[in-house]
Amino acid sequence: MGQLCCFPFARDEGKICEKDRREPEDAELVRLSKRLVENAVLKAVQQYLEETQNKKQPGEGNSTKAEEGDRNGDGSDNNRK
């Protein structure tokens, strides 16, 4: 009886096929990584804009300095020396 081979290609040909299959996966990973970075940057910019807008409206008490003082147990008036 002859030998039963599990691989349809010789080992060198199989490696070439594996390499070809990895390239689209690598391209997909690069694309997804870029998208994640873009989303993170957009989120950071939005957060920055919200924080700067809140600082410009002192009457509402939404400034980040006042919130930090409240977290520490001190009012915003107590932070000034």
Curated annotation (Swiss-Prot):
Pfam families: AKAP7_RIRII_bdg. A lipid is attached at G2 (N-myristoyl glycine). It is found in: Lateral cell membrane. GO terms for biological process: cell surface receptor protein serine/threonine kinase signaling pathway; modulation of chemical synaptic transmission; protein localization. Residues 65-81 have a biased composition (Basic and acidic residues). Keywords: Cell membrane, Lipoprotein, Membrane, Myristate, Palmitate. One of its GO terms (cellular component) is hippocampal mossy fiber to CA3 synapse. It is a lipid-anchor. Residues 49-81 are annotated as: Disordered. Residues 29-42 are annotated as: RII-binding. A lipid is attached at C5, C6 (S-palmitoyl cysteine). Residues 2-11 are annotated as: Required for membrane localization. GO terms for molecular function: protein kinase A binding; protein kinase binding. The keyword rRNA-binding does not apply. Its main location: membrane. Binds cAMP-dependent protein kinase (PKA). Interacts with PRKCA; only the cytoplasmic form is capable of interacting with PRKCA. Targets the cAMP-dependent protein kinase (PKA) to the plasma membrane, and permits functional coupling to the L-type calcium channel. The membrane-associated form reduces epithelial sodium channel (ENaC) activity, whereas the free cytoplasmic form may negatively regulate ENaC channel feedback inhibition by intracellular sodium. This is A-kinase anchor protein 7 isoform alpha. It comes from Mus musculus (Mouse).
